[in-house]
């Protein structure tokens, strides 16, 4: 396996940057055209475009790169470093990292490594890479980058979530990562900078919660792919306060459009999406949902659960250490990544969703190579079976060879959910029309 810092052909990174840029610009142009009726959406398209241009441009000043999600972003901002997140989602980046990653690496890890490989960095010491170790693939990437001479700081996710020892280990690692960022950008962590960063993050996440409740009303107004782009842009913005204001404007525009339409809800099966995360510009899964007429009412994965994290720092006073501890504990309590042997937080979250949202089916998305979500699938299948909610396990990657096969299966799943809805409505009409005697006849037949 070749080292990342030693490409076999000098022009490869240039071709990779061009391919990545074209892939992103094509996807952005298409989605911007589809949502021209929402002027505020342009802001989030521009943020994503600026991020792409930065990642494909010349890197000169000290840069803090976060590979994936899972590290408290408010602490990194408070430390003075505006983090440049690489989330994944790029098929082109996967292709350019194929011969530099283990064969069993998942598409997200491949995409992250492809982005890191193409970066135009004159001195690798000017880049600090933070890597949350929530999967086996991320551990392998961290090892490869270390071997290649990059400046890497890892944050290990403890395998046990209900252990006080694990919590202390997590807080210690988060503190070390925050200090490493401050040292890298020659800044200081203060209680004032921490409070400011936490306040901005709380406002942004609270606004995102309201935004998501609005867009789930009517997907004809705002597509699943556009929703993913807006969610991802949280990680790409350099000014979180400005991002929050524009998200509020976009939410108002969407709501006004919904009110003008009159019909707030689509007559489509309402599903819960969980498992592996979906990142822009990977349009594969959202397009399948649209083709199969499935309405995603909730999406739960490690990248989206950050919007549920609202640290309470009022009791921390002016102590920077207490604020750091409060933030780290909040992230630890809400983490739904696959790092844990038993992810009780994820299980509890699913139970809460079923109590508050009408869910007719579940799409359990698994990217090939991400074995962690598969470990939890058996428990969820049994749980959803008891709740009488069908589960569709969909394993795929960033390639498009299996799209037609997946579309057929997805449409069959959608049709099955629709028929179940009609059957239940027919039974309810019979109960209303015939009264308790109809229920007694049904019970006697089942016996």
Region locations from a protein language model:
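Acidic/His-rich segments in extracytoplasmic proteins that coordinate ligands and/or metal ions
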Residues: 113-179
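Gly/Ser/Thr-rich loops at beta-strand to alpha-helix junctions
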Residues: 65-74, 132-139, 275-281, 368-375
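C-terminal regions of proteins
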Residues: 381, 385, 391-430
């Amino acid at each position: 396996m070749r080292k990342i810092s030693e490409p076999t052909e000098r022009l490869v990174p240039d071709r990779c940057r061009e391919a990545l840029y074209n892939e992103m610009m094509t996807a952005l142009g298409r989605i911007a055209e589809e949502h021209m009726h929402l002027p505020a959406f342009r802001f989030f398209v521009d943020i994503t475009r600026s991020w792409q241009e930065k990642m494909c441009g010349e890197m000169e000043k000290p840069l803090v790169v976060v590979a994936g999600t899972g590290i408290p972003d408010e602490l990194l901002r408070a430390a003075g470093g505006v983090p440049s997140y690489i989330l994944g989602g790029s098929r082109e980046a996967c292709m350019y990292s194929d011969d530099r990653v283990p064969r069993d690496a998942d598409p997200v890890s491949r995409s992250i490594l492809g982005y890191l490989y193409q970066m135009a960095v004159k001195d690798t010491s000017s880049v600090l890479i933070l890597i949350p170790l929530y999967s086996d693939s991320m551990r392998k990437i961290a090892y490869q980058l270390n071997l290649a001479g990059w400046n890497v700081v890892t944050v290990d996710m403890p395998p046990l979530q209900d252990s006080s020892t694990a919590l202390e280990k997590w807080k210690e690692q988060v503190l070390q990562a925050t200090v490493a960022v401050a040292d890298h950008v020659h800044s200081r962590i203060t209680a004032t900078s921490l409070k400011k960063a936490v306040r901005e993050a709380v406002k942004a996440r609270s606004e995102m919660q309201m935004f998501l409740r609005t867009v789930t009303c009517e997907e004809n107004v705002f597509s699943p792919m556009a929703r993913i782009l807006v969610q991802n842009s949280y990680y790409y913005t350099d000014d979180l306060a400005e991002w929050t204001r524009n998200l509020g404007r976009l939410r108002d525009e969407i709501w006004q459009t919904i009110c003008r339409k009159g019909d707030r809800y689509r007559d489509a099966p309402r599903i819960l999406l969980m498992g592996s995360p979906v990142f822009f510009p990977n349009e594969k899964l959202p397009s399948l949902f649209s083709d199969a007429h499935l309405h995603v009412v909730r999406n739960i994965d490690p990248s989206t659960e950050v919007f549920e994290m609202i640290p309470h720092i009022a009791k921390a006073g002016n102590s920077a250490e207490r604020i750091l501890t409060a933030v780290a504990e909040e992230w630890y309590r809400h983490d739904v990544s696959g790092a844990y042997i038993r992810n009780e937080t994820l299980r509890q979250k699913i139970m809460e969703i079923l109590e508050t949202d009408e869910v007719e089916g579940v799409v359990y998305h698994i990217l090939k190579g991400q074995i962690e979500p598969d470990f939890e699938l058996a428990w969820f299948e049994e749980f959803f079976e008891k709740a009488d909610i069908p589960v569709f396990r969909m394993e795929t990657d960033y390639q498009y060879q299996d799209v037609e096969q997946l579309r057929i299966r997805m449409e069959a799943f959608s049709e099955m959910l629709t028929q179940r809805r009609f059957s239940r409505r027919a039974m309810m009409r019979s109960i209303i029309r015939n009264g308790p005697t109809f229920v007694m006849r049904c019970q006697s037949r089942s016996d």
